[in-house]
Swiss-Prot record:
Family, as annotated: Belongs to the BPG-independent phosphoglycerate mutase family. A-PGAM subfamily.
Record's protein name: 2,3-bisphosphoglycerate-independent phosphoglycerate mutase 1
Catalysed conversion reaction: (2R)-2-phosphoglycerate = (2R)-3-phosphoglycerate
Record keyword Heme present: no
GO molecular function: metal ion binding; phosphoglycerate mutase activity
Cross-referenced SUPFAM superfamilies: Alkaline phosphatase-like
Source organism phylogeny: Archaea, Methanobacteriati, Methanobacteriota, Methanomada group, Methanococci
Pathway: Carbohydrate degradation; glycolysis; pyruvate from D-glyceraldehyde 3-phosphate: step 3/5
Role noted for this protein: Catalyzes the interconversion of 2-phosphoglycerate and 3-phosphoglycerate.
pH dependence: Optimum pH is 8.0.
Regulation: Inhibited to approximately 20% by EDTA.
One Pfam family this sequence matches: Metalloenzyme
Length: 411
């Protein structure tokens, strides 16, 4: 049996709840290609992690790729650090960071330091990256201006520490505290508190910040770490599935997740992770990637952004653009060679402006699937499909079976 190639195409924040007319953006959107895929595939509903669990995009993607998020997800920090291109090692402690503005009493005046430019951030980065405190190496990389990632590398560290970011302005930078009684957590908290003071001393009168003050702009004179996580021991995708895999996405969080499990990240110009992303660029990149890779993960983020803004019409427009994107893809792939999963990672209902535990429609398309009677791709039609109701952990198992890659259990 020839082993087929696999695509998991995730529309971030796909699912929704019905409005007063009983409609969702997906049900109301004109999506002829998605409907055709549903008509030619096997449909159902999926909860990425489990029924009743509101997943983050990171934990949902891990689950769909067959990784137990309760075992390998330690926090957002490592994913952000991988996402900005840092080369992390097992045991590193990683954090998300903002450049921020504080006064001489460490009261936060601006959590984003007036949204400093990437060029300014790169200069300030040099003052932090490479520091050493109590035998622990400090690694820092800025990303998209005021954002960045911080990594501590050394012995006797723990991710069980609180945030330095108070998450509001007009209050002091939070003293970082251990979240358990371990010596490792106490040591890590002490190192971080020392680091923040050193960073302030190095950045406060830096030429970049002196120039910003002259222009009436807030100085970027501290970093605020949050979301601590330890880089886990994790089986790489190629070892786990014996497939060469890639990822196409625009958002740093998903890029970081992909890099953590060893997927090659394919960069697409104009792929922004927003409703204004380069949809067709991603579609063409997917078609090209299938010439080289056995497996491709695609994430398209725009619908989720629209949901978080509570913008029903924009979500509908994004879904229609994704449908055009899929039309191009399906003109260029062979049903005898590719198994295609179309789904989301979670629901983001317009009414909530946040993730919910509502299940997501899913369809699996390919030559050997048992086609059911579903003719539309939406939350209601897919509920009647022969795939019924599955969890994210089942997706890769189904693909491995369809492509002849799984092992028989028993005689």
């Amino acid at each position: 049996m020839k082993k087929g190639k696999c695509v998991i195409f995730i529309i971030d924040g796909l699912g929704d709840r019905p409005n007063e007319k009983g409609l969702t953006p997906l049900k109301e959107a004109k999506t002829p290609t998605m409907d055709k895929i549903a008509k030619e595939g096997i449909c159902g509903l999926m909860n990425a992690i489990d029924i009743g669990i509101r997943p983050g995009s990171d934990t949902a993607h891990l689950a769909i790729l067959g990784y137990n998020p309760y075992e390998v997800y330690t926090g957002r920090g490592p994913l952000e650090a991988f996402g900005v291109g840092l080369d992390l090692k097992e045991g590193d402690i990683a954090f998300r960071c903002n450049f921020a503005t504080v006064d001489e009493n460490f009261v936060v005046l601006d959590r984003r330091a007036g949204r400093i430019s990437p060029e300014e951030a790169e200069e300030l980065e040099k003052e932090i990256d490479g520091l050493e405190i109590d035998g622990v190496k400090v690694i820092f990389k800025s990303s998209k201006g005021y954002r960045g990632a911080l990594v501590l590398r050394g012995e006797g560290l723990s991710c069980r520490v609180s945030d330095g970011d108070p998450h509001e302005e007009g209050v002091k930078v939070s003293e970082i505290k251990p979240l358990d009684d371990s010596e490792e957590a106490k040591r890590t908290a002490e190192i971080l508190n020392k680091l923040l003071k050193i960073v302030y001393e190095k950045l406060n009168n830096h030429p970049i910040n002196e120039e910003r003050r002259k222009k009436g702009l807030p100085p970027a004179n501290i970093i605020l770490p949050r979301g601590a996580g330890v880089v886990p021991k994790i089986e790489k995708f190629s070892e786990k599935y014996n497939m060469k895999g890639a990822c196409i996405c625009g958002t740093g969080l998903i890029k970081g997740m992909a890099k953590m499990i060893g997927l090659d990240v394919i960069e697409v110009e104009g792929a922004t992770g927003t409703p204004k992303t380069n949809f067709m660029g991603k579609a063409k990149a997917l078609v090209e990637a299938l010439k080289e890779y056995d497996f491709v993960l695609v994430n398209v983020k725009g619908a989720d952004e629209a949901s978080h803004d509570g913008n029903y019409e924009l979500k509908k427009e994004v879904l229609e653009k994704i449908d055009e994107m899929l039309a191009y893809v399906f003109e260029h792939i062979n049903k005898d060679e590719v198994y295609f999963v179309l789904t989301g990672d979670h629901s983001t209902p317009i009414e909530m402006k946040d993730h919910s535990a509502d299940p997501i429609p899913i369809v699996i398309w390919g030559k050997s699937v048992r086609v059911d009677d579903v003719t539309e791709f939406n939350e209601f039609a897919c509920a009647k499909g022969a795939l019924h109701w599955i969890k994210g952990e089942h997706v890769m198992k189904i693909l491995l079976d369809l492509t002849g890659r799984n092992e028989k259990f028993g005689a």
